[in-house]
Amino acid sequence: MKEKFSNRLEGMMSTYIARNPVTGKTQFMQNWGDYDYNASFGGLPALRKYIADVKAYGMMPTFYVAGYLACATTRAGQKYGLDYGIMPLSTSPSSSVAPKGYLDSYGVFNMCPDNETWSDYIAQTLRRLAADTAIEGVRLDEFGWAKPACFSPRHRHIFAEPGHNENMRAQVNIYRKIREAVDPVDPMFSMAAEHYGYDCMARYMDWALDYDVRNNPDAVRKVPFTLFRFYFPECKTAEYNDGNPMMPEYRLFNAWAVMHPNDPELYHITLLENGDAFDSRDVEPLVRTLRRDVYSHRFSARGKAIYTFFNAAGETVKGGVLPTEPAAGKHWVDLLTGEELKLTSVGKQTAVALAIPDQKAACIARLPELLKVKRIDETLLAEIAAANPDTFLILSDPAGNELFRATAVKGKIEIPLAALKLMKNCPYTVKLLQGKYLRDMTGFEF
C-alpha cells in the first residue's frame, strides 16, 4: 500500500480493502467503473432478491454510482481511462501509479463528462442497471460539483472551447441522457446527486445532498437556510449531517431531509404527517415576524398553512410572533404539542402568540376546524365534522408515539382512555389524518 499510494491516499485506500465474506479472500472492494454483478455474492439473481426484500420492507432501494470515477483495474477504466480521463492544466499526482498528466482523485481515473463516449456509457449503464435489477433510483456521487477544466488532446469536448470549463453544463447533458435512457424502463426512477448544482441540472433530479450546515460556519449568519429548497421544491435537498447538535432544529425549521438524522422522533413524525405542505409549491421563505431575530417559513397545502420558526434572539421569545387575521372555521395549533394557540394584539396588529426557547425551532399550523374532543370520565369523545373513507383518528403521546387508531367517520368516536394506561397530568394529542397527511389536530391533558 505504501509503495503504491501517497500518505494522503493510503488511509483512504486501506478502507477499501476488505475480506470478502463469501470467499474469505482479501480484495479491493471499490472497483468503480463497471457496475457488474458480483458472482461470489450470487450474481444478479441474489442482487434482485435483495432489492425485492428491501422493497417488501417498505423502503426504497437505490444504487450508489461514482459517475466520475473509473479504476484502472476495471474494464471501463482500461477501455476509456486514457482516452477520456480528465487531463488538467497541471497535476499533483496523489499516487505513483497514476498516469502522468491525469487527474487522479481517489487514486483512479477521473473521467471527463464533456464528451459523447463517456456520457453515453454512463447513461446506458444506468439503463442496464434499472432493467436488470428493478432498482428504484441512483445517486451519482461527485455530481453537482465542478471538476477542473480538461485539456486532454485525446478526445473532443461537446461544450468547452480550449481553456474553458463547461463541466457543469456537461453534467446536465449526462443527466438528460440518463433520463432519456432510463425513463422508458421506469418513468418513476429516482435521480440524485451529491449536490443539486444549479437549476438546469436540478430539473432532471428528484433530490440531492447539500452541505450547507457542514460547510458554512454559523458565525456568519443567525440560522442556515437554502433558498434553492424554496424556489425549486421539486428537487429535494438532503442536508449532510456530521453530528451537528443543532441539526434537528435546523431540519425542522427548513423542512429538510437529512442524511443520518439525529432528530427527535416527534420532529420526524411532524415532517412526515405534513408532507403534503412541505412538498408543496405554495411555499414562502422568511415570512415577516414581529420579533427581531425570529425567522419563519410558510408551507401550504389542502387548506392548511404550516409555519416553522427558529429563534435566534438570544433569549426565549413569548407573545405575539406571527402577524395574522382571524379566519372563520380555522384555528391555530402547535404541531409539536397539540396546544391550541391564541391570538393576541401587538400594537394595531393581530398575531399568533407562542413561546420559543432560544436556539430552538417551532412548528405551528392554521388548520380547518374538523375535530373537537371532550373528556367524560375515562372516555374521550371525539367529534368529527367531516371524514373521507381514508381518514383516521389517532391518539399520540408527547413523543409522537401512536397509542390508538380508528377509522374516522363523521360524527362521534369514543376513545377508552383507561385501557390505554395514560400518565396523569401529561399532554396528549388527537389527530385527524386523511391518508398519510394531517387534516386537523387538538390536544388534551389526562
Question: Which stretches of residues belong to each language-model region?
Answer:
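Aromatic- and carboxylate-lined catalytic core of secreted/periplasmic carbohydrate-active enzymes
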Residues: 246-308, 357-366
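Glycan-recognition surfaces
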Residues: 76-108, 112, 168-269, 290
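Catalytic domains of carbohydrate-active enzymes, especially glycoside hydrolases
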Residues: 1-25, 132-136
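Carbohydrate-binding surface patches
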Residues: 290-327, 388-392
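C-terminal beta-strand-rich structural cap/linker in extracellular carbohydrate-active enzymes
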Residues: 344-376, 419-424
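Short, aromatic- and glycine-rich surface loops/edge beta-strands on solvent-exposed regions
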Residues: 362-365, 393, 423-436
